[in-house]
């Protein structure tokens, strides 16, 4: 694992393909259901909100929720995490204990090597403390007398002088301009030891001086007035340690056990009942919470065939992220094992679109491993299926919604007035998708002086209302240009749905006379010279189409079939995809495959399990950038 001095969470190669967000977002776990007697478990390999380092296979956070009578009773929620050994990036310094805590990696202590010895064998976890790792890298960089090494937390390490032969380097550590320490290292002297080459800054914890900053010097040079020093290892811990004591509360959870011998830590909701009710978000611990669907059709009646509720309340765990940076929305871990098949779908992989309130979203990705690759046409298969759902103003009917590469799109009118009014209601028949811009049933009043604002430059102007309020003249504009005008009769006796609805149709992509804008008028009236109208349904789709045609390439995948009968889109990889160590593959545009930078890959078959000992690890993911 590397923690760069400049806080960049994922490599620059990913930044160019990531989504940009300007505020907090949620790292979502797989969708689950509130079913009595069921226990759900998530770990670092299937919940992106927990910390996991795929390269070193480090990260062992777990959360289990035992549901009883629609709630989590006393100790029904259990969070456990375990520290694991891993090498410090500059391996000459030895190893450390890393523990995932509430989704982030923390330092639990040194466990062997030079920094362990220099810290008096002190392990923070035994003192009920952990700390953030601010810097851990072994990249070479050159510093000069006038250009100090910038660390985190306002620290700077400056080279004050180098003797003429380059053997002695005088250093000064400062924080926010205040001198904290000074010393001399000797990286270039004959037979220099690790101690000679390493600058250490310590702070007292648990009766011992623990290393908080370490810098390894590769060499030094002084000549002609120039001073150049090369460092190839930097390590820094946060001085703000986190206290973990039995009984401490974190949201609805409390510390239940801290075991320094096994390096484990457990929290439960002891003495606190957590109920599940629809449309709620409940903080469980720190930034990790539980969100339930705002679900209209909850049905807990038991199906006699399955023995399960017909349609129980849906929920998911999540972690809210606010700190700027680039994050990976990753699916569950996979392994490159010959003959294995790995599947991700909309309810298990948050990189796909899923509307938990409506239970809407049907994307799936199957990866079929053959030796160390995905063979052409059969190795990777992506399928998206359109689903029928009602519009917000339900009298208008239903539409086909299809999720494609993680985003929801309009695939056609399934039934109702808009299907009847559209010459080409099925968008998949034209190999195209359209974005829904507005689908709203909120009541809104506008008048002859203030048009109804729509998306993409459209406005609906109320031109006039007759004295009886029966006839309403409207005009539709786009970017100031008149597109359409009509008269509707929302208030006349016996008015039909068509009488009450303004509809604008036009050509979208390859489809003729598709309903683009619709507004339902609830009533209209006049007051003096002013006309007013109340609307309670607005619908708008984009007038530009996204074409999805057979043969189109999306990353390493190609559209194989667009089926307007089954309302599906299928893509496959036409070319073979090799899965090798330390790779980042653009499988489906922004949906990618990351393989581990794995030092040991052992495909020897274990006689007990029948599986390889330590195959190459990978996961699919989508990158999201949170801007400051």
Locate the predicted segments by residue.
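Surface-exposed, beta-sheet-biased, low-hydrophobicity segments with strongly acidic/polar composition
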Residues: 22-628
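Secretory targeting signatures
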Residues: 1-24, 159
């Amino acid at each position: 694992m590397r923690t760069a001095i400049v806080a960049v969470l994922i490599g620059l190669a990913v930044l160019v393909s990531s989504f940009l967000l300007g505020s907090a977002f949620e790292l979502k776990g797989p969708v689950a259901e509130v079913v009595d007697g069921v226990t759900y478990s998530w770990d670092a390999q299937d919940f992106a909100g927990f910390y996991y380092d795929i390269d070193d296979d480090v990260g062992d956070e777990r959360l289990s929720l035992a549901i009883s009578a629609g709630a989590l009773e006393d100790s029904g929620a259990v969070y456990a995490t375990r520290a694991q050994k891993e090498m410090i990036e500059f391996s000459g310094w030895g190893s450390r204990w890393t523990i995932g805590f509430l989704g982030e990696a923390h330092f639990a202590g040194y466990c062997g090597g030079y920094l362990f010895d220099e810290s008096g064998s002190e392990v923070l976890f035994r003192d009920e403390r952990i700390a953030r790792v601010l810097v851990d890298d072994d990249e070479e960089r050159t510093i000069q007398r006038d250009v100090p090494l910038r660390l985190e937390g306002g620290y700077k390490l400056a080279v004050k002088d180098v003797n003429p032969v380059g053997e002695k380097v005088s250093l000064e550590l400062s924080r926010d301009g205040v001198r904290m320490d000074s010393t001399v290292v000797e990286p270039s002297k004959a037979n220099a030891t690790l101690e000679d080459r390493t600058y250490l800054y310590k702070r007292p914890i648990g009766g011992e001086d623990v290393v908080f900053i370490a810098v390894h010097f590769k060499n030094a040079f002084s000549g002609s007035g120039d001073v150049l020093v090369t460092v190839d290892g930097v390590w820094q811990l946060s001085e703000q340690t986190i206290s973990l004591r039995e009984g401490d509360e974190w949201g609805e959870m409390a510390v239940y056990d801290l075991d320094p011998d096994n390096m484990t830590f457990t929290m439960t909701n002891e003495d606190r009942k957590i109920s599940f009710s629809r449309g709620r978000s409940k903080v469980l611990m720190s930034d990790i919470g539980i969100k339930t669907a705002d679900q209209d059709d909850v049905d807990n009646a038991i199906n006699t065939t399955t023995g399960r509720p017909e349609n129980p309340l849906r929920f998911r765990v999540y972690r809210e992220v606010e700190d700027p940076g680039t994050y990976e929305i990753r699916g569950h871990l996979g392994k490159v094992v010959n003959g294995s098949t790995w599947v991700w779908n909309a309810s298990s992989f948050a990189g796909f679109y899923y509307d938990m309130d409506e239970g809407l979203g049907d994307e799936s990705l199957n990866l079929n491993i053959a030796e160390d690759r995905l063979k052409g046409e059969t190795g990777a298969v992506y399928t998206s299926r359109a689903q029928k759902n009602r519009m917000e103003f339900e009298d208008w009917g239903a539409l086909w919604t299809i999720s494609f590469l993680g985003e929801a799109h309009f695939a056609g009118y399934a039934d109702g007035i808009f299907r009847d009014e559209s010459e080409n209601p099925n968008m998949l028949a034209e190999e195209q998708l359209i974005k829904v811009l507005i689908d709203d049933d909120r009541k809104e009043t506008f008048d002859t002086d203030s048009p109804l604002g729509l998306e993409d430059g459209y406005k609906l102007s109320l031109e006039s209302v007759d004295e009886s309020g029966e006839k309403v003249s409207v005009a539709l504009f786009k970017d100031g240009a008149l597109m359409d005008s009509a008269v509707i009769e929302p208030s006349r006796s016996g008015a039909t749905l068509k009488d009450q609805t303004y509809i604008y149709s036009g050509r979208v992509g390859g489809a003729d006379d598709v309903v683009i804008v619709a507004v339902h008028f609830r009533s209209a009236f006049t007051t003096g010279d002013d006309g007013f109208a109340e609307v309670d349904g607005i619908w708008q789709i984009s007038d530009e189409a996204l074409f999805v045609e057979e043969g189109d390439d999306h990353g390493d995948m190609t559209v194989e079939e667009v089926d307007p009968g089954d309302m599906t889109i299928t893509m496959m990889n036409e070319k073979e995809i090799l899965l090798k160590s330390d790779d980042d593959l653009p499988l489906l545009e922004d949906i990618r495959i990351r393989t581990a930078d794995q030092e040991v890959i052992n495909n020897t078959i274990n006689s007990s399990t029948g599986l390889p000992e330590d195959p190459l690890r990978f996961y699919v993911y989508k990158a999201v950038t949170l801007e400051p």
